Design a protein with these regions (language model features):
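GST-like domain detector, emphasizing the conserved glutathione-binding G-site
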Residues: 1-129
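GST-like fold's C-terminal all-alpha helical module
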Residues: 103-200
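Carbohydrate-binding/catalytic loop surfaces
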Residues: 165, 212-216
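Conserved beta-strand edge residues that scaffold enzyme active sites
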Residues: 34-36, 192, 212
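Residue-level detector of family-conserved "landmark" positions at structurally sensitive sites
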Residues: 31, 69, 188, 208-209
Length: 216
């Protein structure tokens, strides 16, 4: 078995996959892809051969290449079923996917590097306007995530029950991003508590951006 992860230390999507790999105790080799240096290493010819979309993360498993973080996590869950991150029950599975997609599909694309670069370089927004944009969509998305947890009463120590799922692999990086952009996560008490429970686990600790070999 050979697992390689092309990752950027501060990428939320890469962070999700690192958490999933760690929760499953899967060893892997990290290849840093600097999204900021000289316009971004992701646009290089060499990396386009790895991932034609020029995004991170990309997982390579025994020569097979996979991108899109949720697809990667689902692949890992099906290939390495120990410590399941997606429940077997159809209702529970759909709920975990729903929570994951609130973050991966609705929040994060509006705050990723390519979006912020476009806002600054093409639309000529200043830093204050870009930060306001980021905060707006983070708050809207996490408001919805928190409302689902409050309504459904299915969360425990984590987003769905008392063991981490794919939803928590998505939530923790988003809470990190929220704090980075000046959003106080204590406005969502349940999310803050889940974040604390995750932070107590070594799988989440070792996935943290500050612990990555390409951290700056």
């Amino acid at each position: 078995m050979s697992l390689e992860l092309y990752s950027y230390w501060r990428s939320s999507a890469s962070y999700r996959v690192r958490i999933a790999l760690n929760l499953k105790s899967l060893p892997y080799v990290t290849h840093g892809v600097n999204l900021m240096k000289n316009g971004g290493d992701q646009w290089s010819v060499a990396y386009k051969e790895v991932n034609p979309q020029s995004r991170v993360p990309t997982l390579v498993h025994d020569g097979q290449r996979f991108s899109q973080s949720l697809a990667v996590i689902e692949y890992l869950d099906e290939t390495f079923p120990d410590h399941r991150l997606i429940p077997r029950d159809p209702v529970d599975r759909a709920r975990v996917r729903m929570l994951s997609q609130i973050i991966a599909c609705d929040i994060q694309p509006l705050q990723n590097t390519s979006t912020t670069v476009y806002l600054k370089e093409k639309l000529k927004l200043d830093d204050a306007a870009v930060t306001a944009w980021l905060r707006e969509w983070i708050v809207r998305g996490l408001d919805a995530y928190h409302a689902h947890l409050e309504r459904d009463h299915l969360s425990g120590k984590f987003s769905h029950g008392d063991t981490p799922t794919m939803a928590d692999c998505c939530l923790v990086p988003q809470l990190f991003a929220a704090s980075r952009f000046g959003v106080e996560v204590t406005r969502w008490p349940r999310l803050a508590l889940i974040g604390e429970n995750c932070a107590a686990m070594s799988a989440f600790q070792h996935a943290h951006p500050s612990r990555q070999p390409d951290a700056q």
